[in-house]
């Protein structure tokens, strides 16, 4: 069974993330969405809220599981018998950072492979940070995040 982990802070989950999840779920037998605390970013949603938002927008995908974690990604993979890290790439600038992370993860555990998946072109500009910025200033986030969570993002952005 090919088990992959798609890690990220997903704060909030965007249509770009969902695109990778939907496509990744067709490639792997099981896809675990690893929701992490990113100490370098100020969060819009608490980790438990992010898990629930992701579950809400992925409930139609049967082989996806959403789990929060804190710590090393390699340890998370081992805990769930996963050998593959799935990473979405928007641009060459993403690749440079993700390539270094893939090398580090492989150094920590040579049995772990990182698979890169290009984001669909219509989402190549999209990031959680840009969604937060647009929502904070009252802009329309329709088409940027799954419709099921638009009201959650708008409501939280006004706080």
Curated annotation (Swiss-Prot):
Top-rank EC class of the record's enzyme: transferase
Cellular localization per UniProt: Cytoplasm
A GO molecular-function descriptor: ATP binding
Site (Transition state stabilizer): residue numbering on this chain: 17
GO CC term (a single one): cytoplasm
Entry superkingdom: Bacteria
Pfam annotation, one family: CTP_transf_like
A single GO BP: coenzyme A biosynthetic process
Catalytic activity, reaction form: (R)-4'-phosphopantetheine + ATP + H(+) = 3'-dephospho-CoA + diphosphate
Cofactor (UniProt): Mg(2+)
Pathway of action: Cofactor biosynthesis; coenzyme A biosynthesis; CoA from (R)-pantothenate: step 4/5
Protein's name in the database: Phosphopantetheine adenylyltransferase
UniProt organism field: Clostridium botulinum (strain Alaska E43 / Type E3)
């Amino acid at each position: 069974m090919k088990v992959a982990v798609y890690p990220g802070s997903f704060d909030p989950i965007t249509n770009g993330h969902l695109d990778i999840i939907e496509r990744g779920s067709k490639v792997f037998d099981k896809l675990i969405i690893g929701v992490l605390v990113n100490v370098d970013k100020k969060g819009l949603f608490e980790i438990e809220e992010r898990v629930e938002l992701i579950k809400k927008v992925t409930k139609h995908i049967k082989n996806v599981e959403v789990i929060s974690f804190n710590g090393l990604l390699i340890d998370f993979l081992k805990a769930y018998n996963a050998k593959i890290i799935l990473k979405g790439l928007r641009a060459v600038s993403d690749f440079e950072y993700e390539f270094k992370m893939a090398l580090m993860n492989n150094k920590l555990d040579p049995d772990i492979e990182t698979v890169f998946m290009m984001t669909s072109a219509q989402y190549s500009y999209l990031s959680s940070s840009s969604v937060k910025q647009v929502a904070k200033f009252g802009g329309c986030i329709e088409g940027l995040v799954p419709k099921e969570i638009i009201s959650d993002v708008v409501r939280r952005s006004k706080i």
